[in-house]
Structures are given as structure tokens and as C-alpha cells.
Amino acid sequence: MVSLTTCCLKNIVNQHAHVENTVLLYHLGLRWNCKTLYQCTQCNGVNYTNSHSDQCKNKDLFLMKVIVKKNLAVARTLLSWGASPEYARLFCRNTEEEQALNVQQVADVSSSKILERLTMSYKENDEQLLITFYLLNLSTNFSTNLREQVRFNIVSYIICDLAIHQTFKIFYAKNYSLSTLYCIFLAIYYKRYTALRKMVKIYPGLKPFAYLTGFMFDDERVMETYNSTDDEISECKNRIIAIKGCYGNFHCRSDIDHMYAFSQNNFW
């Protein structure tokens, strides 16, 4: 059954979604980044056009983003539209926002389970991947749990080649967070080039990492994504050859336990 709050919000946004009413819409949590929010009746997501399209946003990911940005009005609206309070609590546990959103009584789902759902949400489109990237890098509430979960995800069902382990090791040693490396890797793995360009613009020092990973998958689009000198490309190719020369092309994806043990013993 649809709640009274949801019905009221829907009626308000349908009748007042024009310029002179933006103050009211902001106050009710129906505006975000100067755009009016609508709940999609087809996919139950969130959009700016009041019609279903591939631009509809996942409510849970969107909820986490607005909480990180401390926009509690929009967070309340998304919760009333059915976004998961577990996600909200993950990002505001033991803070004033937790009480303001009244999610302190929500059952304490383990962070690792929620993070697993979060890190499996990147497949839908570039924007979903970028939201995940921003959340993992902006939030201060993950600490050790994030590192462990990202490590598990990388090792268990993403990595195809031992050379990838070495690449993560090299750049992790340069103090780039695992979550950042993970999202860059996913952008290449799932060919999300728009997201990849935006991420590397934020962290230009990760260009070589993107090259290395792209060459490992024989993905020449990664090269075309940036304006790079021949020297940079040549250097990356040489590093790939050197890494594969040391570790070979031994694939270990078929045995998750072995992959995890190998990673624990050698690279972390």
C-alpha cells in the first residue's frame, strides 16, 4: 500500500513542478541539483523527467549519495518512496543524521553484506558506476570493512590474471585507495568509458593504471580514451610485457579459494 506521505508528495510535484515553486519543492525534498525529482512508476527508480528511461536512478544508490552530501530533505523523500533504510544507516551510523532520519532502530545488517550489494550495482550504466565511485571515496564510515569487502570482490569474481594482482599492488603502494582502484578496474572491465574518463580526470595519476589494466584485457579503447604521448603508451606496454613475463598468463579465476589464499599470501 502506498503511504499517505508518498501520495501527497506525488500530488505536489505533479502540480507544482515549475520555477516559481522551487522553494517549496526544495523544502519537501523534491529538488536535487536544480532539478525536480519524480518516482518512476515503471521501474520504481528516480528520474528528472517523470517518464521511464535508461536514465532512471537506483533509489538506494541515490539515497546514499544524498546522505553523503547531507541533504536530509531528499533523503526523507527517498525513504518514503521505498529506498532501503539499511543503506541510509550504513552511511550515517552514530551521527546526527541517523537520528534526524529516524533510522537508528533499523535492524543492523552487516556492512559487508550491504557493501556487496553496493559493489555489484555498477553493471547497469556509467552513472551507476560513477555514483558507486563517489560514494566509496567520499564516505568516512567504511574504514576496515570497505577494504576487506573490496579486496574480496576483486579477488573472488573479477580478477582474470595474476598480472592484475601485481598492478593493484603497484598502485596500492602509491597510497591510492582500494575502492578507487576497484572502480577504475570495473570501468575498464565493463567498458564504461564515459565513467572511466571522469574518474581519471579526478585522479590523473591513475592514467598508467588504466593503461596497464586495459592492455591486460587487450582493450585498445582505453588508449583512445586519453590524449597520451607515444612514450606513455610504450612505457605501459613494456610494463605489461615485464609483468606477464614474470607471472605468465596463468589463469586462476576458476578457484576462488585459491585466488583468495594467493592474494593474502603474496600481495596484501
UniProtKB/Swiss-Prot annotation:
<feature type="topological domain" description="Cytoplasmic">
    <location>
        <begin position="1"/>
        <end position="175"/>
    </location>
</feature>
<comment type="similarity">
    <text>Belongs to the asfivirus MGF 300 family.</text>
</comment>
<keyword id="KW-0812">Transmembrane</keyword>
<dbReference type="GO" id="GO:0016020">
    <property type="term" value="C:membrane"/>
</dbReference>
<dbReference type="GO" id="GO:0033644">
    <property type="term" value="C:host cell membrane"/>
</dbReference>
<keyword id="KW-0244">Early protein</keyword>
<protein>
    <recommendedName>
        <fullName>Protein MGF 300-1L</fullName>
    </recommendedName>
</protein>
<keyword id="KW-1043">Host membrane</keyword>
<feature type="topological domain" description="Extracellular">
    <location>
        <begin position="194"/>
        <end position="268"/>
    </location>
</feature>
<feature type="transmembrane region" description="Helical">
    <location>
        <begin position="176"/>
        <end position="193"/>
    </location>
</feature>
<keyword id="KW-1133">Transmembrane helix</keyword>
<keyword id="KW-0472">Membrane</keyword>
<comment type="function">
    <text>Plays a role in virus cell tropism, and may be required for efficient virus replication in macrophages.</text>
</comment>
